[in-house]
Regions:
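N-terminal intrinsically disordered/low-complexity leader segments
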Residues: 1-8
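Amphipathic alpha-helical segments enriched in hydrophobic/aromatic and basic residues
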Residues: 4, 23, 32-33, 44, ...
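Helix-turn-helix
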Residues: 14, 18-56
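An amphipathic alpha-helix signature
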Residues: 16, 124-131, 143
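Amphipathic alpha-helical segments that line or abut small-molecule/effector binding pockets
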Residues: 17, 80-92, 106, 147, ...
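Amphipathic alpha-helical segments used for helix-helix packing
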Residues: 81, 93-120
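Hydrophobic/aromatic-rich alpha-helical bundle segments in the mid-to-C-terminal region
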Residues: 112-121, 134-184
């Protein structure tokens, strides 16, 4: 029996959520369609009813994940709140649920230019949020500083996940968090 339109919509959402998580945890190229469908609790045969290809799935899943981050509660608070959340041991440990750019940056950079539009839009959105936080704190928006702050956040998360020294990993997060929030 064919799923109802509502079931099909729910299935598609589960596929997108599962793919976004698995891609961020393992990398796009390391995750196959079978793993995504199994993780979503669906059969492989249903995949092509939702997506043209794995590339189509990757593009949509990553856009979905990045859009969810820009709409997240963390972005509705203050810069200090965002820094505490983004530059935290919990976020560091949760690559599958965290920042797509920090989890997949080098892999995203190797995507064809035509497929990097959602990533570019996401980064522009993060920069805009940084500029908005500058305004909220009484400062004049400084795009250059906003770009540097976004790069600092992403870079700190990447480095903290890369090193094999837990104390250094924590120090990286804390140093950038303190610098960005003015607590240094």
């Amino acid at each position: 029996m064919r799923p109802t339109k509502e079931q099909a919509k729910d299935n598609r959402q589960r596929i997108l959520d599962t793919a976004a998580k698995l891609f961020r945890e393992n990398g796009i190229h390391a995750v196959g369609v079978d793993a995504v469908m199994k993780g979503a609790g669906l059969t492989h045969g249903g995949f092509y009813g939702h997506f043209k290809s794995k590339s189509d799935l990757a593009e949509q899943a990553l856009a979905h994940a990045m859009q969810n981050m820009l709409g997240a509660d963390a972005l509705s608070g203050s810069l200090d709140d965002f820094a505490e959340s983004y530059l935290s041991p919990e976020h560091r440990a949760a690559a599958g649920a965290g920042c797509t750019v920090a989890a997949l940056g080098p892999e995203l950079a190797r995507l064809p230019e035509a497929e990097r539009g959602p990533v570019t839009d996401h980064i522009r959105g993060l920069i805009a949020h940084m500029e908005n936080w500058q305004t909220q704190s009484g400062s004049k928006p400084d795009r250059s500083q906003a770009i540097a702050d976004v790069a600092s956040f992403v870079g700190a998360l990447v480095l903290s996940r890369t090193v094999n020294d837990p104390a250094l990993s924590d120090e990286i997060l804390e140093s950038v968090r303190n610098r960005v929030t003015g607590k240094a």
